[in-house]
């Protein structure tokens, strides 16, 4: 299917990215919405809403409507999406043409329908084309979907990790894990609390993750600020790379195991493509220091992070929106 006008949406657990045909990326903001508790009025969406999280007034509630890559709160997701599209100044006529929406490869039919429903609330009578995230990631990494060559994609998002072999515009083999960057942050928060008696906020945990990553050689460390679990007072602490690596080990191991299991089931005619094409890491989790090296060491196949991994899926969705060549269609929902 080829779309010459419309909108491409990567509605992620952590961030939402919106591209318009002919204009490119116009929205890249946190998937968050702030609502007035008493009236339900939208107070803020995106960055402004996310900035209120943990600091919001008593009469304001901050929601993150997606969980594990799919919609957990349909009303909040619809309102958030409406705010983004209004800010993008999307003309109503354009969306009557087409919308390309990225979904986790492991999303159920019900979860896919909820995404279509969220969009239909915002703009009725549109054609929603669901595209599996690994396919969009392959397009965003520069691979021609019209060609039959296979590419191995590991897309580590905020709520899910997708391991997939993509060839000819469709998924040949895939596994979806309901863990990603958010689970890594939570693991760091939990480990630091247990090991150091320090309560960390989400942003502090994320900084430890992206700075120290899997540096478990004992040489790396980072200063962070949290709340002493016993005294309930602010405290400065030096956190080692070894402790962060320990916190992340079970998640990284699950990702590596999934990659290895996928490789053991790869069709022989695609094996050469994968080895020569390398394992391509996309998504925010791809920026975890040491993850690509860990996958390469476990598999013996070069693993590299794609250019601008945070926007790779959105870039591919925009490419499919404007060109669509070679895409094997997923469910199409007419509204």
Please give the residue ranges for each predicted region.
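Nucleotide/phosphate-binding catalytic cleft detector across ATP-hydrolyzing
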Residues: 1-154, 166-280, 286-335
């Amino acid at each position: 299917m080829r779309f010459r006008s419309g909108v491409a949406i990567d509605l992620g657990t952590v961030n939402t990215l919106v591209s318009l045909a002919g204009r490119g990326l116009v929205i890249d903001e946190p998937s968050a919405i702030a609502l007035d508790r008493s009236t339900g009025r939208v107070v803020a969406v995106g960055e402004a809403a996310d900035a209120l999280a943990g600091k919001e007034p008593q009469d304001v509630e901050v929601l993150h409507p997606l969980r594990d890559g799919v919609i957990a709160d349909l009303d909040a997701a619809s309102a958030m999406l409406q705010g983004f599209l209004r800010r993008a100044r999307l003309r109503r006529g354009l969306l009557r043409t087409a919308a390309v929406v990225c979904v986790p490869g492991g999303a159920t039919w019900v979860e896919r329908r909820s995404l279509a429903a969220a969009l239909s609330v915002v703009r009725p009578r549109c054609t929603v084309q669901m595209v599996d995230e690994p396919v969009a990631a392959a397009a965003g990494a520069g691979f021609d979907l019209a060609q039959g060559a296979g590419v191995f994609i590991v897309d580590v998002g905020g709520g899910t990790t997708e391991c997939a072999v993509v060839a000819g515009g469709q998924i040949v083999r895939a596994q979806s894990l309901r863990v990603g960057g958010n689970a890594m942050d939570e693991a760091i928060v939990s480990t630091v609390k247990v090991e150091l008696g320090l309560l960390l906020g989400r942003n502090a945990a994320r900084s430890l993750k992206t700075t120290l990553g899997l540096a478990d050689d004992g040489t790396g460390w980072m200063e962070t600020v949290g709340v002493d679990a016993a005294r309930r007072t602010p405290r400065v602490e030096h956190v080692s790379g070894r402790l962060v690596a320990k916190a992340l080990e079970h998640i990284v191991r699950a990702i590596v195991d999934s990659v290895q299991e996928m490789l053991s089931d790869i069709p022989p005619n695609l094996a050469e493509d994968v080895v020569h094409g390398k394992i391509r890491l996309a998504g925010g989790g791809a920026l975890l220091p040491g993850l690509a090296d860990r996958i390469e060491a476990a598999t013996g196949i070069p693993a590299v992070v794609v250019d601008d991994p945070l926007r790779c899926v959105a870039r591919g969705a925009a490419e499919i929106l404007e060109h669509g060549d070679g895409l094997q269609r997923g469910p199409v929902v007419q509204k």
